[in-house]
Amino acid sequence: MGKIIGIDLGTTNSCVAVLDGDKARVLENAEGDRTTPSIIAYTGEETLVGQPAKRQAVTNPTNTFFAIKRLIGRRFKDDEVQRDVDIMPFKIIGADNGDAWVEAHDKKMAPPQVSAEILKKMKKTAEDFLGEEVTEAVITVPAYFNDSQRQATKDAGRIAGLEVKRIINEPTAAALAYGIDKKQGDNIVAVYDLGGGTFDISIIEIDSVDGEQTFEVLATNGDTHLGGEDFDNRLIKYLADEFEKEQGMNLRNDPLAMQRLKEAAEKAKIELSSTTQTEVNLPYITADASGPKHLVVKVTRAKLESLVEDLVTRTLEPLKVALADADLSVSDVNEVILVGGQTRMPKVRAEVSAFFGKELRQDVNPDEAVAIGAAVQAGVLSGDVKDVLLLDVTPLSLGIETMGSVMTKLIEKNTTIPTKASQTFSTADDNQAAVTIHVLQGERKQSSGNKSLGQFNLEGIEPAPRGMPQIEVAFDIDADGILHVSATDKKTGKAQNITIKASSGLSDEEVEAMVRDAEAHADEDAKFEELVTARNQADGMVHATKKQIEEAGEALPAEDKEKIETAMSAVETAVKGSDKEAIEKSTQELMEASSKLMEIAQAKAQAEQGQQAPEGEAQAAKPDEDVVDAEFEEVKDDKK
């Protein structure tokens, strides 16, 4: 069985790890980095992922996607999506099913389809390291992701050619990474996870009993639309406002200028974690009739902190709720772990430290801990990691809509998963022949205040007065936190059941079509690589042949020279095209035409060697010295 890899699919950066022996190892990508920017660019000719996509973002802002995780599993009309529509340089559109999609080069794409490009790069990184195909993965998601966001993440995995063996919550993965080597007894750990686009807090009990380590999530809370991107946006707004005050020009309608501003704001924010002042300097940011305009703004750490103070404060309320849900006080928490790049900000660290009244752990890498935890969980699933039990929870309550538009909960939030629950309901009207089961997720009493996960009908109920039929509704949450619902008429035994997907979401057919599309592109990529190799070999052959013609000089007969030059011309023409077979054929023909050159070079080398060697040695030459001569000639060519 192949390795199961662990992937942290992040808003800003992604990371892949694998169990190497008994330790989880973070893998370096093709660029030599341990994390990969979660940026995807469509150039019209190819798809770029990671650092190559980031490098060209300024010149291709409308077709370069970042923070796509903020859209995954969301509806276009959601408030969070509408906020992003106004500030993103790329186009966010409403799909036919109501989902939030994106558009590049007039092609509409679902967020799982775009995210799959990042997962494919993670998959390739692991395959390059392991030297074998990878088909299975554990992928992390924010703990506060709802059912449709989790399902969309699994869809992204399928499109990338991965069977997602488990969806695991990011704070839980970080706790696994932190606690796997620590064998002490009962320990309450708070994992504060502030990433690029999401925020989670999980209270986790790590216990060691009879050699088995148990990681039990006691409570989780968070905000799936709060993260480093929001911090960046505050600084971007400030810089744009300052420029408008000074120059009287609005940069917000210029995607190119806004992309440059975004890069500069992110860089300034990072710098201000280690220095108290920085300067944002963007020459030629725009121009008007009077000439080019430059943006030069000094930003202090204090200014940045004042811009984002309310965002930091917003993270503290979920901490209070999570502690209350776990029935714990601040003093019960033994360790505080910070995860996510945004936790490097001194203001964030100070506020969290003050809230818990203790020093924060410094031995956890905020960028890599989640991927390491995912790899550990992959090891648990494959049987490579023994004596570890992970007990996660569902982050939000689940229930159905009942009479009066009320949400009746069947499974409360922070219930350990996998879990099952059932409840018996009845009809609201006399002789009602069918009931609609409307499945909801959230904490509000009024059904409209919660997330609709989907609905289905149970038909064929025998006529009876209202309140008489007995309809059992059963909820079953699997280890990925994904919900399966069934409804059964107890009298007739008629049943209806579904695996809940979002009321929109991608259908199986759409996912399969995207998988086929991804596979087709993989074939295209492989063919393109073969074509480039053939071109490089042909170019190399032409270059070497020209050099040998020059060296041969008058020794090469005019007839042979003409034949070789004709063959070279054919290669140069073939290289301009895209026919790999034609390039290889013309290269082979050039090799055959150049045989006279090889003879001349060999004779010349033998003559030179004969002059250098003593006469007796020259007479005693052995037949296999031809091989030495050829090697000698190659070295000589290199030196020239």
UniProtKB/Swiss-Prot annotation:
Residue numbers spanned by region Disordered: 601-640
Top-level division of the source organism's lineage: Bacteria
HAMAP family, per database record: DnaK
Sequence intervals crossing the membrane: none
Sequence ranges of Acidic residues compositional bias: 626-640
Protein name: Chaperone protein DnaK
Biased amino acid composition, Low complexity: 601-621
UniProtKB keywords: ATP-binding, Chaperone, Nucleotide-binding, Phosphoprotein, Stress response
Entry's induction text: By stress conditions e.g. heat shock.
Keyword Chaperone: yes
Protein purpose: Acts as a chaperone.
Organism from which the protein derives: Shewanella woodyi (strain ATCC 51908 / MS32)
InterPro entries: ATPase_NBD, Chaperone_DnaK, Heat_shock_70_CS, HSP70_C_sf, HSP70_peptide-bd_sf, Hsp_70_fam
Record-listed Phosphothreonine modification sites: 198
Record-stated family: Belongs to the heat shock protein 70 family.
Pfam family, one: HSP70
GO molecular function, one term: ATP-dependent protein folding chaperone
